[in-house]
Regions:
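Transmembrane helix boundary and interhelical loop/hinge segments in multi-pass membrane proteins
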Residues: 88-110, 114-115, 122
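Actinobacteria-biased recognition of intrinsically disordered, low-complexity terminal regions
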Residues: 1-27, 256, 260-271
Length: 271
């Protein structure tokens, strides 16, 4: 009977796998202060702004036609619109910090095929954001409905579309983090990645808003943020929004398209 050579055993032990790459990326995320602060900021923004906006709506309750179209779920989830910035910045930092310090050369030397590194970062940032944003979304929904209940404006998880909107808010933040990761991988600059993120989510919708009314509505509903946030509403306005899952699908398509472009650059470009 022949025994494996020590060299073969060593090569097997040191073989790069996607699971090992993901463990490495998870360690980087846990030990990077900027990333952890971004994750914490996302949770705080979801909860704090959701509660604050619920209090404001109780102080100024809707009347007439506004009361008929009032969406208590989206009120509680209003913080998602701010938290998307923190989630996106988390994605940017997860890769641009390595370019800033030069660690990316060591990372790519350890993972010569390169792409498993990007997929590992994508999996880790998605998992981390979902893990904290689902409890945050559920908590702020319950808190917001308790506040809105003072004016009999509340709803419950049992109502159609409510659970989807709450979980959709958490999923939206996860995709926002992927969007940030893709932009960071493409631009390889923290400032550039964050600026591009702000431009895509905030500046472009403002510019589109200057177009003639119907054209602005038609184009606006397909923009990343507007499309994705449709999943956080129970009854989206068909004039200005896509249906919930269609809108979320469009948002995912933006993230995947940019992630694909980032993969091409990572595979072909220099570190």
């Amino acid at each position: 009977m022949s025994t494996p050579r020590p060299e073969a055993q060593a090569n097997s032990t040191l073989r790069v796998t996607q699971a090992r790459v993901m463990r490495s990326e998870w360690t980087k995320l846990r030990t990077q202060p900027g990333a952890l602060w971004s994750l914490l900021s996302a949770v705080i923004l979801v909860v704090a702004f959701g509660i604050l906006y619920s209090l404001l709506r109780v102080a100024r309750p809707p009347h007439g036609a506004a009361a008929a179209s009032f969406d208590p779920t989206s009120v509680s989830l209003a913080g998602v619109q701010l938290a998307q910035v923190a989630a996106g910045v988390l994605g940017v930092l997860l890769i641009t910090s390595e370019y800033a310090t030069g660690l990316i050369r060591t990372t790519l030397a350890a993972v010569p095929r390169r792409l498993p590194t990007l997929w590992g970062k994508a999996a880790v940032v998605t998992g981390a954001v979902v893990a904290v944003s689902v409890p945050a979304a559920v908590a702020v929904f319950l808190a917001g409905q308790a506040i809105l209940g003072r004016q009999h404006l509340s709803t419950s998880f049992g109502e159609p579309g409510v659970a989807r909107a709450v979980i959709g808010g958490a999923l939206y933040l996860a995709v926002a983090a992927l969007l940030g990761l893709a932009l960071g991988a493409l631009l390889r600059s923290t400032a550039g990645g964050i600026a591009a993120l702000f431009g895509l989510l905030f500046a472009v919708p403002i510019l589109v808003g200057f177009l003639p009314g119907s054209l602005a509505d038609e184009i606006g509903k397909y923009l990343p943020g507007t499309a994705g946030l449709a999943v956080t509403t129970v009854h989206p306005d068909p004039v200005t929004s896509l249906s919930p899952w269609t809108g979320f699908g469009v948002f995912c398509a933006y993230a995947l398209l940019l992630l694909g472009a980032a993969a091409v650059r990572l595979r072909r470009g220099d570190a």
